[in-house]
Amino acid sequence: VSSIQERLYPTLPCFGCGHANERGLRLRSHEGDDGVVTATFTPWPEHDNGLGFLNGGIIGTLLDCHSAAAVMLEADKRGWAALGGAALPYVTAGLDVRYLRPAPLTEPVELRATVAAAAEPEITAAVELWWDGKVRARADALWKRWRPRA
């Protein structure tokens, strides 16, 4: 089964979720039967924060890019396509991240995202990073309609 990223934006070069970026994280998110968008990510040794845990910047990227999957899926369902030849219909306008506990460097982590509110001008999503039955980090993501200027 192809991921949301592979279906909706397969040529995107984004570091976190772009499958066209060979050196990126290439996150693969899927919609569950309950409407929750999920993904599993296995960190690389290079993602070390210096203390043997997953780096906060990588966590932020994962939360941002996983929220993107939930937002782009919602936009697709509502027919809110990209405008003016843009690669995506929405762009990150805000990401309020909270780090709650260390996340492992050597084991897969789970990402969960839901759309909290959706209107064409902006969509908000709640996203969490889980490991060992506990939330390790969470974020509220604000996405704004991308309107390219000529």
Positions of PLM-derived features:
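HotDog/MaoC-like acyl-thioester-processing domains
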Residues: 1-11, 103-110, 114-150
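Hydrophobic beta-strand-centered segment that forms part of the acyl-chain substrate-binding groove
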Residues: 70-110
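Hydrophobic alpha-helical segments of small multi-pass membrane proteins
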Residues: 61, 65, 95-98, 127-131, ...
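Hydrophobic residues in beta-strands and at strand termini
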Residues: 41-43, 99, 145
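Non-catalytic linker/capping segments at the edges of enzyme domains
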Residues: 1-50
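Short connector loops at helix/strand junctions that flank enzyme active sites
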Residues: 22, 34, 55, 66, ...
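A conserved, well-ordered hydrophobic junction motif at loop->secondary-structure transitions
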Residues: 38-65, 69-74
